[in-house]
């Protein structure tokens, strides 16, 4: 059995493959990595013989995760990191290792599936990356995600208190609606402008792939054509692992 783990800044997501069967594992929004590893292993039916990890949580977190995995099941995890080129994708970063591996494997998967592609990852940060038909990573954007924007607004304003709710693009009629709707509109406007601009550089029929935990909040407001690919990072990580078989 093979276990695939996507470690973000504030969460961990996983799934596993047993033979030809893929099992959707789960996810956890917290940074107490020892606890998350324990919960992840409890969720599995059986124990993995191979573990692959794509992590942007930093060296200390990676060491912690590796330690608890080895302690629990005596299995040394494979950490995959961004590099200059792989699977036909060429990085434009002067220091390729500094590119978040979640973005990197998502671009690899997008390019391997569709060629030229625009990858939108709606996580704690909202990222947009572009790969052309030759596999060249053209560059990208990183801005705060919806949760980070809400947190910053609430932290720096004493009289704004909002309850969780569904956002829409229309005018808000309460402080909470004004916050939710305004942040949604701002994020959607940014993404839409970038997508339209990139489609003038790339083939205007290139695929737009949307992933990340906040994607369900955003995609209902997109007016451009896209594909929702919630497991894009894990798909890319599994592609990397399959090469080693």
UniProtKB/Swiss-Prot annotation:
<keyword id="KW-0067">ATP-binding</keyword>
<feature type="active site" description="Proton acceptor">
    <location>
        <position position="102"/>
    </location>
</feature>
<comment type="similarity">
    <text>Belongs to the type III pantothenate kinase family.</text>
</comment>
<dbReference type="GO" id="GO:0046872">
    <property type="term" value="F:metal ion binding"/>
</dbReference>
<feature type="binding site">
    <location>
        <begin position="6"/>
        <end position="13"/>
    </location>
    <ligand>
        <name>ATP</name>
    </ligand>
</feature>
<dbReference type="GO" id="GO:0015937">
    <property type="term" value="P:coenzyme A biosynthetic process"/>
</dbReference>
<dbReference type="InterPro" id="IPR043129">
    <property type="entry name" value="ATPase_NBD"/>
</dbReference>
<dbReference type="GO" id="GO:0004594">
    <property type="term" value="F:pantothenate kinase activity"/>
</dbReference>
<keyword id="KW-0808">Transferase</keyword>
<feature type="binding site">
    <location>
        <position position="93"/>
    </location>
    <ligand>
        <name>substrate</name>
    </ligand>
</feature>
<feature type="binding site">
    <location>
        <position position="124"/>
    </location>
    <ligand>
        <name>ATP</name>
    </ligand>
</feature>
<feature type="binding site">
    <location>
        <begin position="100"/>
        <end position="103"/>
    </location>
    <ligand>
        <name>substrate</name>
    </ligand>
</feature>
<keyword id="KW-0963">Cytoplasm</keyword>
<feature type="binding site">
    <location>
        <position position="175"/>
    </location>
    <ligand>
        <name>substrate</name>
    </ligand>
</feature>
<protein>
    <recommendedName>
        <fullName>Type III pantothenate kinase</fullName>
        <ecNumber>2.7.1.33</ecNumber>
    </recommendedName>
</protein>
<dbReference type="GO" id="GO:0005524">
    <property type="term" value="F:ATP binding"/>
</dbReference>
<dbReference type="Pfam" id="PF03309">
    <property type="entry name" value="Pan_kinase"/>
</dbReference>
<feature type="binding site">
    <location>
        <position position="121"/>
    </location>
    <ligand>
        <name>K(+)</name>
    </ligand>
</feature>
<dbReference type="InterPro" id="IPR004619">
    <property type="entry name" value="Type_III_PanK"/>
</dbReference>
<dbReference type="GO" id="GO:0005737">
    <property type="term" value="C:cytoplasm"/>
</dbReference>
<comment type="pathway">
    <text>Cofactor biosynthesis; coenzyme A biosynthesis; CoA from (R)-pantothenate: step 1/5.</text>
</comment>
<comment type="function">
    <text>Catalyzes the phosphorylation of pantothenate (Pan), the first step in CoA biosynthesis.</text>
</comment>
<keyword id="KW-0630">Potassium</keyword>
<comment type="subunit">
    <text>Homodimer.</text>
</comment>
<keyword id="KW-0173">Coenzyme A biosynthesis</keyword>
<keyword id="KW-0418">Kinase</keyword>
<keyword id="KW-0547">Nucleotide-binding</keyword>
<keyword id="KW-0479">Metal-binding</keyword>
């Amino acid at each position: 059995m093979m276990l695939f783990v996507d470690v973000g800044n504030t969460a961990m997501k996983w799934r596993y493959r047993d033979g030809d069967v893929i099992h959707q594992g789960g996810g956890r929004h917290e940074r107490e990595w020892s606890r998350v590893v324990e919960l992840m292993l409890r969720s599995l039916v059986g124990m993995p013989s191979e573990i692959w990890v794509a992590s942007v949580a930093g060296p200390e977190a990676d060491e912690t995760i590796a330690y608890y995995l080895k302690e629990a099941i005596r299995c040394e995890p494979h950490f995959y990191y961004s590099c200059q080129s792989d699977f036909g994708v060429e990085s434009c970063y002067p220091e390729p290792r500094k590119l978040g591996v979640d973005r990197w494997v998502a671009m690899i998967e997008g390019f391997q599936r569709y060629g030229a592609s625009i990858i939108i990852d709606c996580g704690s940060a909202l990222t947009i990356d572009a790969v052309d038909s030759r596999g060249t990573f053209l560059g990208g954007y990183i801005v705060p995600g919806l949760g980070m924007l809400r947190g910053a607004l609430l932290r720096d304003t004493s009289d704004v208190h909002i309850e969780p709710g569904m956002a829409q693009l229309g005018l808000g009629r309460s402080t909470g609606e004004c916050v939710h709707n305004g942040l949604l509109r701002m994020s959607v406007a940014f993404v839409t402008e970038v997508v339209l601009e990139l489609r003038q550089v790339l083939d205007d029929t290139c695929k737009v792939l949307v992933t990340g935990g906040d994607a369900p909040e955003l995609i209902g407001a997109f007016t451009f054509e896209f594909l929702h690919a919630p497991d894009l990072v894990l798909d890319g990580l599994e592609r990397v692992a399959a090469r080693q078989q």
